């Protein structure tokens, strides 16, 4: 088995491998860090490389922490019945992973999100590592596996739900029975003439 396979097997169930102790120590530092922080190298090298990471100029990995659970909505200042305030039990239509990708893109506006993966969670928050690519970097423009990102059609792809996490949330990972109303999008499908 290759080194990447050993790492992959260990991360399948982190609680049953050496990853548990590593995560326990790491998270103590992660909690003190800012919510979006650039890191030198990926925590899960197998997953990062599988999703398109290469150690070269123009590619950056960022760790993002996002709250767990439902949406944290502000309480209305004007009086309302508690039942109609809409504070508790409000869930975002986006996944937490998608929120993490968007926050990373907002922090680095000159870069495009390639992909992201889970690296840990505790009772309060989840951590994701987001792979960002600089489309203006010459080494990216000359690489066939990345230069498709340099086209204008991929600008702001994360906010348009074009990453893997975005497509999953829009129902575009499925085909056939049960997915008839997902294309071209849920909203556009309702507007189609019968």
From Swiss-Prot:
<keyword id="KW-0689">Ribosomal protein</keyword>
<dbReference type="GO" id="GO:0003723">
    <property type="term" value="F:RNA binding"/>
</dbReference>
<keyword id="KW-0687">Ribonucleoprotein</keyword>
<comment type="similarity">
    <text>Belongs to the eukaryotic ribosomal protein eL15 family.</text>
</comment>
<dbReference type="InterPro" id="IPR012678">
    <property type="entry name" value="Ribosomal_uL23/eL15/eS24_sf"/>
</dbReference>
<dbReference type="InterPro" id="IPR020926">
    <property type="entry name" value="Ribosomal_eL15_arc"/>
</dbReference>
<dbReference type="InterPro" id="IPR020925">
    <property type="entry name" value="Ribosomal_eL15_CS"/>
</dbReference>
<dbReference type="GO" id="GO:0002181">
    <property type="term" value="P:cytoplasmic translation"/>
</dbReference>
<protein>
    <recommendedName>
        <fullName>Large ribosomal subunit protein eL15</fullName>
    </recommendedName>
</protein>
<dbReference type="GO" id="GO:0003735">
    <property type="term" value="F:structural constituent of ribosome"/>
</dbReference>
<dbReference type="GO" id="GO:0022625">
    <property type="term" value="C:cytosolic large ribosomal subunit"/>
</dbReference>
<feature type="region of interest" description="Disordered">
    <location>
        <begin position="161"/>
        <end position="194"/>
    </location>
</feature>
<dbReference type="InterPro" id="IPR024794">
    <property type="entry name" value="Rbsml_eL15_core_dom_sf"/>
</dbReference>
<dbReference type="InterPro" id="IPR000439">
    <property type="entry name" value="Ribosomal_eL15"/>
</dbReference>
<dbReference type="Pfam" id="PF00827">
    <property type="entry name" value="Ribosomal_L15e"/>
</dbReference>
């Amino acid at each position: 088995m290759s080194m990447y396979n050993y790492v992959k097997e260990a991360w399948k169930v982190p609680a049953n491998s050496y990853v548990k102790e590593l995560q326990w120590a790491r998270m103590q530092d992660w909690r003190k860090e800012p919510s979006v922080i650039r890191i030198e190298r990926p925590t899960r090298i197998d997953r990062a490389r599988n999703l398109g990471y290469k150690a070269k100029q123009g590619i950056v990995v960022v760790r993002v922490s996002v709250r767990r659970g439902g949406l944290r909505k502000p309480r209305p200042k004007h009086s309302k019945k508690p039942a109609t305030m809409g504070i508790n039990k409000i869930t975002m239509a986006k996944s937490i992973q998608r929120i993490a990708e968007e926050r990373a893109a907002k922090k680095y506006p000159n870069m495009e999100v390639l992909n992201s993966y889970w690296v840990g969670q505790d009772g309060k928050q989840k951590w994701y590592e987001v792979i960002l690519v600089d489309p203006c970097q010459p080494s990216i423009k000359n690489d066939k596996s990345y230069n498709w990102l340099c086209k204008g059609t991929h600008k702001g792809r994360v906010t348009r739900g074009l990453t893997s996490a975005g497509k999953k949330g829009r129902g575009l990972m499925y085909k056939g029975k049960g997915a008839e109303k997902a294309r071209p999008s849920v909203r556009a499908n309702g507007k189609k003439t019968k």
